[in-house]
Each structure stands twice: as C-alpha cells, then as structure tokens.
C-alpha cells in the first residue's frame, strides 16, 4: 500500500520529468566536446592514412613493379592488379584499381610495397556522385601521387625512423 502511495506522489509531482530536466540543465553549461566538422577540423596525425596514391621515380617512371604483394596482403580484397611484361623484360601494371568502399585504410598495402609505390596520403575529404566512382584506377592514383609527391616525400622522410 505504501508503494502505491509513493508512486502516486512521484507521478503527481513529475519527479522523473524534473530529474531529466535537471540533467539537461546541468550539461547545458558544461564545455562542449563536439566539433562542428566542416568549419572546425581535428588536427591530423603525421601518420594519418587517407586516400591512396601511386608514386613515380624522379625520372618519371612509375615505381610499381607489379609484384602484387599489396593485392595479396589486403584483408578487404579492395585492390585489383593486372600486369604485363614490357619489351625490356620488366613487369608493369596494366590495371591498378582500389575499391574505396571495400578499403579499410589499414596501411598493409603501403607496408608491404618493396619500392614504396603505393602510399596513403593525408586526404580525408572526398566524395562520389555515382556508384562506379568509388573505384580509383591507375591514372587517377598516379595523378594524386604526382600532385602530392613533395608532401609525400616529406612525410615519408619524417616517418623514416619508425619504419
């Protein structure tokens, strides 16, 4: 009987509602931890792994030797490579695709590459308008690498002690 009376007074005085309002009021004046993303940005780590890029040697020749280690080590199976032999007997890629919907940005491809061909850049913000645009092909990867080569080389040199 006492339980029913207590419950009646609690519901009559709306104690649960007042408790919720007090909690809201208490957190209203505390500092906010939310970052308003497009206007404010988090500081990026020097080892941040973002959009991929293929690098070239200083003479302009692409670094990838089509060893397919990155394709083999990729846990998400996001990398597809086709290769062909050239006239001089070396192998080069004819197709190098990365499906960014599958990629988990683990960095294994970058670690396994013996010639530092595939790297992950600092680029975080990219979008796709259509479904097929999520597959980044070899010319696109080379263009990203050409555009950011100075920055990539600088970041690799700064991180060389930890590799």
Curated annotation (Swiss-Prot):
It is found in: Cell inner membrane. Binds 2 [4Fe-4S] clusters per subunit. NDH-1 is composed of 14 different subunits. Subunits NuoA, H, J, K, L, M, N constitute the membrane sector of the complex. It is a peripheral membrane protein. Its EC number is 7.1.1.-. Pfam families: Fer4_7 (PF12838). HAMAP family: NDH1_NuoI (MF_01351). Residues 54-84, 94-123 form the 4Fe-4S ferredoxin-type domain. GO terms for biological process: aerobic respiration. Keywords: 4Fe-4S, Cell inner membrane, Cell membrane, Iron, Iron-sulfur, Membrane, Metal-binding, NAD, Quinone, Repeat, Translocase, Ubiquinone. Signal peptide: none annotated. One of its GO terms (molecular function) is iron ion binding. Its main location: membrane. It comes from the Bacteria. Its cofactor is [4Fe-4S] cluster. It catalyses: a quinone + NADH + 5 H(+)(in) = a quinol + NAD(+) + 4 H(+)(out). Gene3D superfamilies: 3.30.70.3270. The gene is nuoI. The keyword Secreted does not apply. NDH-1 shuttles electrons from NADH, via FMN and iron-sulfur (Fe-S) centers, to quinones in the respiratory chain. The immediate electron acceptor for the enzyme in this species is believed to be ubiquinone. Couples the redox reaction to proton translocation (for every two electrons transferred, four hydrogen ions are translocated across the cytoplasmic membrane), and thus conserves the redox energy in a proton gradient. [4Fe-4S] cluster 1 binds at residues 64, 67, 70, 113. GO terms for cellular component: plasma membrane; respiratory chain complex I. Belongs to the complex I 23 kDa subunit family. This is NADH-quinone oxidoreductase subunit I.
